[in-house]
Amino acid sequence: MTEISRFDAYPPTLTVNPIVPADAPATEHLVWTIAQAAEERKAGDLVILKVTDVSYLADYFVICTGFSRTQVRAIADNIEKQVELVHGQLPTHTEGNSESIWVLQDFGDVLVHTFMPEEREFYKLEAFWGHAQEQTLADIATAIGVAYNAPTSP
């Protein structure tokens, strides 16, 4: 039986930077795709934690904020859509989509947490995983061999 994506009815278009060297590390490439997809939907306060040395759950956590339930859902949907297009994979598990105050997406080596501001402040994952190594998009870009120009404020 063939698995059908919920995006099959309206095929999405690739919007994240697809030009990544073929020999780029797969996990960092996945983090790059997730971060770019989140930023595309105007996610706030994007944090990337490398938890390889402190957790067996995943290699990376990507944490971001949406400022309405609609935006949280849009961020999570765009991440799923772009990861499926670029990497051909869907999350193995997703929680919180119906409430859209905290959506957790499990992509195996990368866990994505998209929060509303109040929930992010309450759970404080960055503090809980404070011993993890924080990465920037520039760090991830360097790891996969692409150029990254940080957005400038107007």
From Swiss-Prot:
GO terms for molecular function: ribosomal large subunit binding. One of its GO terms (cellular component) is cytoplasm. One of its GO terms (biological process) is negative regulation of ribosome biogenesis. Functions as a ribosomal silencing factor. Interacts with ribosomal protein uL14 (rplN), blocking formation of intersubunit bridge B8. Prevents association of the 30S and 50S ribosomal subunits and the formation of functional ribosomes, thus repressing translation. It holds the Pfam family RsfS. HAMAP family: Iojap_RsfS (MF_01477). It is found in: Cytoplasm. InterPro entries: Iojap/RsfS/C7orf30 (IPR004394), NT_sf (IPR043519). Keywords: Cytoplasm, Repressor, Translation regulation. Belongs to the Iojap/RsfS family. The gene is rsfS. This is Ribosomal silencing factor RsfS. Interacts with ribosomal protein uL14 (rplN).
